[in-house]
Curated annotation (Swiss-Prot):
GO terms for biological process: hydrogen sulfide biosynthetic process; sulfate assimilation. This is Adenylyl-sulfate kinase. It catalyses: adenosine 5'-phosphosulfate + ATP = 3'-phosphoadenylyl sulfate + ADP + H(+). The active site is at S108. Its EC number is 2.7.1.25. Belongs to the APS kinase family. InterPro entries: APS_kinase, P-loop_NTPase. Pathway: Sulfur metabolism; hydrogen sulfide biosynthesis; sulfite from sulfate: step 2/3. It comes from Staphylococcus saprophyticus subsp. saprophyticus (strain ATCC 15305 / DSM 20229 / NCIMB 8711 / NCTC 7292 / S-41). It holds the Pfam family APS_kinase.
Length: 204
């Protein structure tokens, strides 16, 4: 891919801090990671709704949705998976700069790729949430029928079946989606945001 050296970064007249003060909350990336069927999308949708009801400015990026547009030229090879997460990381960084709480739901199977996104952001701007769930339970849910297709050889490189998933080394939050309800999971995340002062920024 060709790149250009003749580009300049243009600073905005409105800073990230000013946007956070206007919104009265800090901006951050809430990054859900876990196997297909572990509950990432379900919990992220419920979290977005709960935060919206509290007048929090959010946007949710979903793994399937971005492949309809931004990443529709990517497949599921290790190289394409890496590029998929790199692009989402850059988009998430822009949204954090815009003052939003950005909720992402991606399998994001590789620790190194998740760490690269974390390193794009400032300190405390990345909250990794691991939706912990056994492969057996994920496969029994199989909301899209993908596990069965992978078992039948119709899908190659499917995470958990014939491609690896690396559990997070030290996530900020672990949700046991085999035990915890959606409501419990959402409350756990919101409690974390409150305790760590993400939801209380006073306007100047």
């Amino acid at each position: 891919m060709a790149t250009s050296n003749h580009i300049t970064w243009h600073e905005s007249a409105v800073t990230k801090v000013e946007r956070q003060q206007r919104n009265q909350h800090r901006s951050v990336v809430i990054w859900f990671t876990g196997l297909s069927g572990s509950g990432k999308s379900t919990i992220s949708v419920a979290l977005e709704k709960a935060l919206y009801q509290q007048q929090v400015h959010t946007y949710r990026l979903d793994g399937d949705n971005v492949r309809h547009g931004l990443n529709n030229n990517l497949g599921f090879s290790p190289e394409d998976r890496k590029e998929n997460i790199r692009r989402i990381g850059e988009v998430s960084k822009l949204m954090v700069d815009a003052g939003l709480i950005t909720i992402t739901a991606f399998i994001s199977p590789y620790q190194a790729d998740r760490d690269e996104v974390r390193n794009l952001l400032d300190d405390k701007e990345f909250i990794e949430i691991y939706t912990s769930c056994s492969i057996e339970t994920c496969e029994s849910r199989d909301p899209k029928g993908l596990y069965q297709k992978a078992r039948n050889g119709e899908i190659k490189g499917f995470t958990g079946i014939n491609a690896p998933y690396e559990e997070p080394n030290n996530p900020e939050i672990i949700i046991d989606t085999e035990q915890d309800s959606i409501e419990t999971a959402v409350n756990q995340i919101i409690d974390y945001l409150k305790v760590h002062d993400y939801l209380d920024v006073k306007p100047v």
